[in-house]
Structures are given as structure tokens and as C-alpha cells.
Amino acid sequence: MIQNMAYRKLQVIRISFHNWEDFFSIINKYPEKGADKMKQFKIIATAASGMEALVGKELRDLGIECQVENGKAIFHGDIETIATANLWLRTADRIKIVVGEFKAVTFDELFEKTKALPWEDILPMDAEFPVAGKSLKSTLFSISDCQAITKKAIVSRLSEVYHRYGRLPESGAKFPLEVALLKDHVTITLDTTGPSLFKRGYRLEKGGAPLKENMAAALVMLTSWRKDRPFYDPVCGSGTICIEAALMGHNIAPGFNREFLCEEWDWVDAAIFEKVRTEADAKADYDIKLDIMGSDIDGKMIQVAQRNAEEIGLGDSIVFKQMQLKDFTTEKEYGVIVANPPYGERLGEEEAVQQLYREMGETYRPLKTWSKYILTSDLTFETHYKARATKKRKLYNGALRTDLFQYWGTRPPRAPRVEKTEE
């Protein structure tokens, strides 16, 4: 009797299929939880212009070989590699899987080559898969048409594989895709990250012109700072630069307190992310004492910065203080100053900002052992600071071109070499 009931249930489930062969083909093709469908992937870590080399260095420090190109670093690996990159990369924007690459100069070619990709290995029948697009120097220049044709090709493939004769439900997990054309070369990618990597989850509030967390991390990484030396941000705002420095000082993975989109996918084993997070927690040095200070003339922003630091558990690692920039004095040596002052882009602000630059020069030039790094879009900064930078580096703060003016301090003396004596 039980067998007859089970058979009748299968008959009901099978109604939407033409025959038993179709039904069992779906059962066999649907991606399973933790299934090893695409063990090795070609992966892209996207980055803002000017930050690609930093992303490449981060990957190599993680033991991942990569190739750095404009706006991205390319590498290969499995799901654990993807989890590691999402969790640990401080300066990247997103981690994407390359689903396919090919040349296309006609819409028919784009359709057929997209349809030929093994979409059933990635997208379950109920997957929600929005398709973004971009095109540069390509025959197929209409982005909306490229998006529509790519979507149509994927739907056609999945409808055949899953034997669907109506619309795909798209009611399940989200799989954001992008079709990108560059000089007729098509790259289709799948985003594993979700909200951009700069969203660490600690910024409860922000100031008027906030610096993204990955940009703040890049500024710290471009300095000579080491965790045993003083670190100071004189215009700290909501505290982002100081918090990113503290995360590095404690060796805390920037993505430790957030989740990633691919964790919702059936073919991504939750145990892999749990393993990577456990290993990251073991690598963190929560007990080290750091000398990090942030100040701002706005007392309300100091309160915001303190709350943000406390949100991520770093309230005791950073000292925030309301203070005018010109009031900073110190007897400490070999510290690092990182500042992202107002740029004076708005009408009427230019003179006030230039006065701030002059105060920076008067306050910081006497600190011969300290290294100073100031980010601004004002290319005349050196004139107001009254000193030529040791080095300048072009960076993009969003779409805005900025320069990091670097003033290197004297190097600390080397520790005396201890000669080994023979016993």
C-alpha cells in the first residue's frame, strides 16, 4: 500500500513532464548541495583603477598566484579559494567566476556561444539570474541588446535541460551575471560576493564625504606603517582609515563579520566557508596593543567614529579625540600620518581647504621621523603644504581622480646585529 501511495505521488509530480525520462533527467541534472560541479574556476577580483597591484599583492600574500590587468586580478582556484578571497581581500570590490569567454561580432554569435555554456552546472531551475552588461570598443555596442540576448540564450538552454515549456520561475537564490564586451571579446561572469567587499558591516554612520573601506585600506597599505609604530589620522571623520589600520594591525579578515551571496547557492558547501572563517579567527591577534589615533574638529564625528569602532570590536584599539589639526604635537618617533582632507570641490570651500593644507605643512613638516600621506584631488597641494612630495601616486576615489602625496620620514635605526658565538 505504501509503495502504491509513493507511486501515485510520483505520478502527480510527473504531470508537468512529458514522460518518465524527462522527469528523471531533471533529478539527475539539478545541482546538489555541496556538489563538485565546477571544481576549478577562473576567478576575477575586480578593483578600482590604481588599486589592481594592491589586490595582486594581497592574493600572492595569501598564496594565490595571479595575473594583474586593468581593473582586475585574475587567478584560478576552487570554492575554498573563492571563500578565502572574499573573506581576506581588503582592497578588491568583488570576486567573480568566469563562466565563459569567446569572440562575438553578431547577435546570433553571442546567442549561440552563450547558449553552448553549461549553465545547468551553475544555475538551478528556480535561479534568479539578472544580467548586467557593458561594452567597449566592440561591434555589439548596444548594452541593453547584449543583456537581452544573453538572458534569452541562458533561458533557452535551461528550458531545454530542465524540460520547462513555460517561463522559468526565477524564485530561488540570486546569481548575478554580467556580460562584458571589450574589442569583440565576450566575458560572462558570475558574482559570488553580493554587496561589494567594501561593505564590512561596521559603519553604522558616516560623514558627508565618506571614504570607502577598501580605499581606506589601500591608503594604509601604501604607507610604511607597521603595527609596532604610531598611526594617526588628523581628519578622521567616521573613523574608516583608523579602523582599517586596526583591522590590519590585529590581522583580522575584513570580511569576517559579513556573509557572501554564494553561501546561498546549493552547490556551495557551507562547511567550506565555516572552515575558512575558523582559520581566519585563529590567525587574528586580538591581544596586540596598537598605537592608533584619530582626531577631527567635529565632535559629532568623533562620536560616530567611536561607535563604528565599537561595532566591530575595536573600541579599545583606537583613541578618537576632538582636536584641531594644528594642535597636534607628539614626542613619539617614526610614526605614520594618513589624511583624507576635504577636497574643496564645492564653490566657496577652496580657500578654507587651502588654509587647512597650509596648517598641515606647518604642523607636520617639523616631524622629520614621521611619514605623511595625504590624499587630495587638488594638484596644487604641494604649493600650499610648502614642500615637494617624495612621491605621488594616482588613485581614483570613486570616479574622482586624486593623488596620494607621500612625504617619507627618516628611517628608524636598525637593531644592532647580534653575533653568534661558538660554544
What are these regions (language model features)?
Residues 41-51, 55, 77, 81-84, ...:
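S-adenosyl-L-methionine
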Residues 324-423:
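C-terminal catalytic and target-recognition region of SAM-dependent MTase-like enzymes
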Residues 39-173, 423:
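Non-catalytic nucleic-acid substrate-recognition regions in nucleic-acid-modifying enzymes
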Residues 18-37:
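Short, Lys/Arg-enriched N-terminal segments with co-localized hydrophobic residues
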Residues 136-139, 196, 342-346:
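A short, flexible beta-alpha/helix-coil linker loop
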Residues 211-329, 345-346, 350-352:
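Conserved S-adenosyl-L-methionine
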